[in-house]
Regions:
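N-terminal secretory signal peptides that target proteins for export/translocation
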Residues: 1-16
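An amphipathic, aromatic/His-enriched active-site/gating alpha helix that lines ligand/cofactor pockets
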Residues: 2, 41-42, 68-83, 99-133, ...
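Bacterial N-terminal signal peptides
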Residues: 17-32
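Sec/Tat signal peptide C-region and signal peptidase I cleavage site
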Residues: 33-39
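Glycine-rich beta-strand-turn "strand-cap" elements at beta-sheet edges
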Residues: 39-46, 83-92, 117-160, 189-201, ...
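The feature marks the first
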Residues: 44-88, 95-98
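Short beta-strand-to-loop capping motifs
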Residues: 51-54, 98, 156-162, 207-209
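Short, surface-exposed ligand-recognition loops at beta-strand->loop->(often short) alpha-helix junctions
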Residues: 53-63, 158-170
């Protein structure tokens, strides 16, 4: 058997090392540039959900515009979340879920150039003015990794009137629903936010499941059915909008 010369061996090792280094660099670069949609937030964090739409013929333009705004916003140091969602059944409708380190950071972004540029470009192609709701964490869970293809659900929950008794009854019902839903096998996000006083009878659910099958399992789960029975007309806390779920995909 002919022995491999030492120079050839050294050349092979050098080439192999270069391949490893290049591969490691590619992996590290991919990890570094992949933006985190959510980060752990502190007690002073401020959140908002915004519903918006564009004309049916302007969907591609709207998608590019909202993606640009997302990328600009995520680069701001005080941003803790900037998730954009597109409605599955009506692709001209979108949701922005954003979070900021504190009120000062939120206000700085709100008055910044990226926000002004986005709203200026959106105005000619939108059907309606954006509808933004300020939120406070109510029943939240640590951020998890959400893989592509997850099915999102955003729901606004409005309990009738400003009756303190109704608000007091609704709060534990919402907590119980969140805690049970967060334990589901297919759930990757289930969080309930509440609007600031005096509108404490308004909640916002932002949730995601691995796929449609996991979402369907949530819909028929005992804790979901119990919550809906308790909040339907004649229940312990009446809802004004029992059927206000919308399904989305992440952009």
């Amino acid at each position: 058997m002919r022995a491999i010369s030492k120079p050839a061996t050294r050349r092979s090792l050098v080439a192999f090392s270069r391949c490893l280094a290049t591969g490691s660099l590619v992996i590290a670069t991919a990890v570094a540039v992949a933006p985190a949609a959510r980060a752990q937030s502190g007690a002073d964090a401020v959140f908002a959900v915004t519903y918006l739409d564009v004309g049916a013929g302007a969907v591609p333009q709207g998608v590019e515009l909202i993606k640009k705004y997302r990328d600009q916003s995520r680069r701001e140091g005080a941003n803790v979340e900037f998730t954009i969602l597109q409605e599955t059944s009506r692709p001209n409708r979108f949701v922005i879920m954003e979070g900021w380190r504190d009120q000062a950071a939120f206000e700085a972004h709100d008055k910044g150039a990226a926000k002004a540029e986005f709203e200026g470009a959106l105005k000619p192609i939108r059907n309606s003015p954006p509808d933004r709701k300020m939120l406070q964490p109510f029943a939240n869970a640590p951020a998890r990794r959400i893989e592509p293809g997850a099915l999102y659900m955003v729901e606004h929950v409005d309990f009738l009137g400003g009756d303190p008794a109704i608000a007091a009854t609704a709060a534990p019902l919402e907590k119980t629903l969140a805690e049970a839903s967060q334990k589901e096998a297919g759930v990757v996000r289930y969080e309930i936010y509440r609007m600031p006083p005096p509108r404490i009878n308004h909640y916002q659910v932002v949730a995601a499941w691995t796929d449609a099958k996991a979402f369907d399992a949530h819909e028929t789960a005992a804790h979901t059915l119990e919550f809906r029975a308790a909040t339907a007309q004649g229940g312990r806390a009446w809802r004004a909008n029992l059927y206000d779920q919308r399904l989305y995909k992440a952009l």
